Amino acid sequence: MVRGKDDEETVTKKFLEWAGDLPMVAHNAKFDISFIEMAMKKYNLGTFKNTVIDTLELSRTLDQGFARHGLSALVKRYNVPWEEDAHHRADYDAEGTAKVFSKMLQKLTSQNYNTIADLTKLVSTAEIHKFGRTYHFNAIALNKTGLKNLFKIISLANTTYLYKTPRILRSKLNELREGLLIGSGCYESEIFIEARSKEGQELTNLINFYDYVEVQPPEVYNHLIQTSDFKNEEELRKHIEKIINATKEAGKLIVATGDVHHFEKEDKIYREIIVNQKVPGGGRHPLAKSNITNIPSQHFRTTKEMLNDFNFLDESLAYEIVVTNTNKVLDMVEDIEVIIDTGGIPFSPRVKSDDGTQYLDCPSVVTELVYTKAASWYGENLPYNIEERIAKELYGDIVYKCCYQNAKENNPDLEEDKIIELTFESLHNIILQGFDKVKELIGEHIEKTWNEEDGVLDEETKKKKIKKELGGIIGGGFDPIYLISQRLVKHSNDEGYLVGSRGSVGSSFVATMMGITEVNPLPAHYRCTKCSHSIFKDDDGKELGATYSSGFDLPDKMCPVCGERLYKDGQDMPFATFLGFNADKVPDIDLNFSDLNQASAHEYTKVLFGVDNVYRAGTIGTVAEKTAFGFVKGYFEDKGITNKRTCEIERLAKGCTGVKRTTGQHPGGIVVVPDYMEVSDFTPFQFPADDPNSAWRTTHFDYHAIDQDLLKLDILGHSDPTQLRMIQDMTGTDILAVPLDDKDTMSIFTSTKALGVTKEQIMNETGTLGIPEFGTPFTIGMVAETKPTTFAELIKISGL
């Protein structure tokens, strides 16, 4: 009230009469209009209906290329004379706003926006979320449905509606609200901000959107006093009381929360250091302002601390919001399994046919691929050791065991050699008849060996027992993984690139027969590429594998059947190396694709499973120890502190190490969501490093958190397949036809002679300088010392 001037009611009436029904223009109009609306309500002057144009929001849509849209920025942009010292005087700001708007009108007219209705066309419906006022809120999942909806909200906020920061439309939040409790949030919440200018029913209407309203201890809002948003703590406390009273009048739950950002009170220094840094991607933390000299302590307060922080309230009211109501929220929440316990075996995706019209019977396809290739390499009547190897890899030991027992029981008078013959004949036929026949065989075995003391053998018990007995690739449910890998390799091969297998997948003969790996894990042997004859023993009946660790080191030999030169094969790798001794370990098939073809292989997964079923494996980048050390030093330099000891800097750096800094993606990891489930059953998704231009979306969780739930394909890029392709193109030589026992090639590991140079010319004792993995100082020294002459020795050196 100004002495000798009209009162508020009179001034409001005069202003409304003067303005009439004309449109009103203001900068940050929502704030200004709220005071007019409050006065009109207070003096029963009706409802405010004038059209309002906000130069702040208009600038955000008209000048999208600019980061700043405050009035001080606009007057500079539109060349309006301006004295910054006079800023925030009502008449001066109004004049400046009018002049800016006049310039804006000229720009709008030049772009053919001539009416107020035309302004609605400035922004498309798809981009409207970029320009609205945003508020913070909290969401608590009450149950599994709520958790799934929470994941969907996080996904949408980080992709569809991502603009500078994650955001979600209120309408979309309402659509996905089932199973969630929506809380009002912190000092950046709608209720905390709008309660400054709204009261009564208007404030109640805002509160009614939320399931519970939050207030934090005054200390948590302390920075708002430093920024002059509040005059003092007394005004801040009254604001908190206003929110509490309005919430109770609205019949909603009012809850005291901590807006926790660090655990102990003394940990505040770590947050101060982090806040002091630039935000990845540009900008500063909201608390990193020059007028905020002391950020609030947002530690995890005890109940006693919380009650003490709200001691300005009535004691019973403080207890209600700190203890009673927080427990009411807790009682609403069910125990939820966030990460599904699968027992370590991921959900397997279904695999579609090449034309995409049907789902493949993976066990049958895998079996057919394996036996077709095995027959072409080793003949229609497979050697017993190969037959047994395939059976054990596909199903574990149980199928061979059942076939042997049946052969023995049905033919008690036959000699062992004949029993073995019948066993393998039965084994071959049963596996080719399919998975159901295998389960039937095991079921019969269980019925025969079941004892009364084991209890009643009903169908459910038998199913569980069959599942327990089964192992291996098909028995363990890993056949889709093999089939997917086979299709990825074939896709790359069809595009003209080799694929190298990494790690222990080479110990799987099934993988070899499916074309996933070129490594043959059988013991050293000969096989004829013309007539499929194979030899595993020498002339004395001794296993070749007992003498030779690698088949590539076998002496040359001609086929005794057709006279063709025999191919030397076999690296003697037990299957347990890959799938475990019980054949129950989840296979991890790592493949090296050409770095020129890796992107194509990644895109092919979208063809195999669909765009919404494949995601890059997400990673979380944290503050490294050395980076944290730099943060601490920079913090003290900004504060003008120069006398800190190194040990103190290291202590503080340790507290900052491991803090999340950004997100990223695994270089080759593709996570596959089976099409009978949704990604929101497991994780939200986002763009890596919040980059909306990324071709891929990533899992929001670090992939390690869900690696036992979802299959991860390791489609890695490597230079070796690229180099081999280039060599093949330059020489016209088929890489796969190059003999691996060439004596001149082997000699370069002990001499430079075969290369036609001297060791002085290349300054190296051997010719390995340009060989991948063998040209480093360490391996050069190892090769010079060990002088390998066989392929097996090279394998051992590579292993070191």
Segments from the language model and where they lie:
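Mg2+-dependent phosphoryl-transfer active-site scaffold
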Residues: Q106-S376, Q405, K418, L488, ...
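Conserved non-catalytic scaffold segment of RNase H-like nuclease domains
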Residues: M1-K49, Q64-Y78, E84, H88
